[in-house]
């Protein structure tokens, strides 16, 4: 079956092939006369009939194939042999070959069993082991069938007729196409239709040629015209690889900003394609101009000092000199890839220019331009531009900065280094990632100093307070805009926050102390120590502490909050809402980072937390916003002064410690973020039924709490409808119910309903007295 019918390019080959065959009478008479006209006349009408038997029909997967046809023939012959052993006989048929195709007609009934047009016949195979058998494959795409036929005489004449049939059809079609082409050429061509028609003609020729050469080739398969699609795929792959390369350079750039970055190297002027106005023109071009240094973005190769980089063409001679001089300066953190850092710094400059308006809209009312001089680096690029958004963030009054005239190595000011180190704070702030010149690129440099959490201002000698203040938490602050600059003022000596800002007071809008848009303070007193603590408002209860101050104008009790160095500022709880510098030094969750130089340690023990809670209870509060876990401040109390208020501890404190162990940690953590209405319900519930959550504990705890509750219970007020903030529970960490009576019955009655509920939420941090 591997012997396919040879195709004839000329009409003379069939005559040469017919001579050595066992000639039939028909071929002897008509063989020499085979022309297109003769063949057309031969196959017109009913065409030629051959007597045969149908061996069988088998479904095949492909349109053509010698091995496939041979397997099907063997299978069908085996089935026919099995049927013959059972007395069955093959169906006697007539094979009719005409211009319409092949028809299989039942010999007895004359019914057309199968009819296959020429364009549905895809393959013909002769059985080389049986000269009376042949088969052909027909059917549409996915529906191919192999018909095995056993002729009454030699199968060769039938196969030759099939070959002649396809040859004449091909020749007729070819003549028609040529005639059509001549007619089209004589006509006037409009709108380029001639090219399309010629293309169609060539396609048809290819189809016909394929069919003729392969003998019943699949005419449904068009020629391969998919090369443009492949080229598009290649272009897309190249573009993606270019984007990935640039992203890798940015991804590696943050590791070069360790304290001493390559800020000492001069920044070249940004390329034109990196400017914001050209950001989406040159970079999105599928055919970018060739890069003189294609490996400049490789973050793992050291820059070759002898060969000029691709950025040298953009530098002025002065900048090149500065580059040669400053590149010889040894860096403490090893060799840095200057070009990669340039790439990142260009991106920072774009980010700074495009997002400057967003940076100015930060919550701090003071711009750093008022307190810090605009420092120019060696290459003339402003420090603010090199730092990205960090300089545009508002200053923090609690950290001093070097004087204006102080010069720092490499001509870069201190806050440049500190801003690079504290970049995790400045990126996660209010400013979203800027629009990048490359798709998928974020401000990756912001995440550089995950290992530098306590390293802000470490390299700044003039800073007047310990470096622990720079990064108070082990987590990147999530909500403060650029806390790096929040830690700096222009005053070199430790002073009060408002004094360090030149005595400017922050006035809070009287009608809207609760602006739920921001979790820290939305234009509220920015000088609170808790605000400096960077994006963890829940740990400090800041929205409760300072947001209520306009409504508590009647509580003019600045004495417990002015335990040390009261600056000349308005009253703490006055309507102006300016806060004393050390008002909440005890609520720091990190071991009081502000204790040195600004807040003396005695402020921790001299102000009992009950004073804060009693002042916060009375005014109506809107429900607090859900935020990070609000139980950090209780842990901070423990870290600051685990033995604080020991002179007023009593039996209630000791039994309270036993109760702290019982509630599971997870429910307590969820309970922290419940609404204030739920906490108020807890307060009223535990005011009358103390110890019920401790049913699984010892009955001694239950009785002791009931006894202490009866001792401590003042005249019960009506259940408070006022929304008590969730952060109230964190301030009650060390409340003493007996000590609160000194403030009067009204305060004691409200505050006494809180100890049990506050203890319910202190459990996740353990008990320092257990």
Curated annotation (Swiss-Prot):
Residues 1-16, 302-313, 366-396, 407-425, 466-480, 604-616 have a biased composition (Polar residues). Disulfide bonds: none annotated. Residues 1-38, 284-482, 604-629, 742-770 are annotated as: Disordered. It is found in: Cytoplasm; Cytoplasmic vesicle, Clathrin-coated vesicle membrane; Membrane, Clathrin-coated pit. Residues 230-447 are annotated as: Required for localization to clathrin-coated pits. Adapter protein that functions as a clathrin-associated sorting protein (CLASP) required for clathrin-mediated endocytosis of selected cargo proteins. Can bind and assemble clathrin, and binds simultaneously to phosphatidylinositol 4,5-bisphosphate (PtdIns(4,5)P2) and cargos containing non-phosphorylated NPXY internalization motifs, such as the LDL receptor, to recruit them to clathrin-coated pits. Can function in clathrin-mediated endocytosis independently of the AP-2 complex. This is Disabled homolog 2. It comes from Homo sapiens. The lineage of its organism: Eukaryota, Metazoa, Chordata, Craniata, Vertebrata.
